[in-house]
């Protein structure tokens, strides 16, 4: 669990697939963490356990962590634009999920990143659904953020 955000799962692993083929067992484990150091530590534990038990382990793909930053100018601007557009405070939520933001954060460590999107429920299930009106709000918010950034860039020039 996160020591920074109450209730947030920080690191987890999931045995998603277990197959048998003759005398060969294959397991597919998904590791996930918002902290890259914890992800690497968990992967190392799997290597140690597999070595102790004469099990071959292969890494097929990796998804980098995206650690929450307490200070974010972009998040502050987002909250201000959200307040101006919708007349209420933006809901800020950290989630335990693999997001593409981690890929960008690993490639450009100082990049200030936020993730926004429409309201989606029952993700990755047969009942998954999305609020169409929230898609419209997200679009309006994105346009307003880009317009504000364009204005700020013009003032800096």
Residue ranges and their predicted role:
Residues 1-12, 46-52:
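Acidic-enriched catalytic cores of C-N bond-cleaving enzymes acting on peptides and small amides
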Residues 43-61:
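FAD-dependent oxidoreductase catalytic-site/capping-region signature
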Residues 1, 68-84:
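Short, low-order "capping/linker" segments at domain edges
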Residues 147-157:
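Generic C-terminal helix-cap and adjacent flexible tail
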Residues 36-42:
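Short, conserved charged micro-motifs
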Residues 10-12, 16-26, 85-146:
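Zn-dependent metallopeptidase/amidohydrolase metal-coordination segment
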């Amino acid at each position: 669990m996160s020591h920074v955000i109450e209730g947030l799962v920080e690191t987890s692993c999931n045995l998603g697939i277990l197959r048998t083929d003759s005398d060969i067992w294959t397991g597919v484990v998904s590791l996930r963490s918002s902290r890259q150091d914890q992800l690497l530590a968990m992967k190392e534990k799997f290597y140690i356990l597999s070595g102790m038990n004469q099990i071959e382990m292969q890494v097929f793909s990796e998804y980098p962590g995206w650690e929450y930053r307490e200070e974010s100018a972009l998040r502050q601007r987002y909250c201000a634009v959200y307040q101006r557009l919708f007349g209420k405070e933006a809901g800020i939520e950290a989630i335990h999920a693999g997001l593409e933001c981690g890929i960008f954060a690993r490639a450009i460590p100082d990049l200030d990143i936020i993730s926004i999107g429409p309201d989606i429920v029952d993700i990755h299930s047969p009942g998954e659904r999305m609020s169409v009106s929230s898609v419209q709000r997200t679009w309006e918010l994105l346009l307003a953020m880009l317009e504000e950034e364009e204005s700020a860039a013009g003032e800096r020039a």
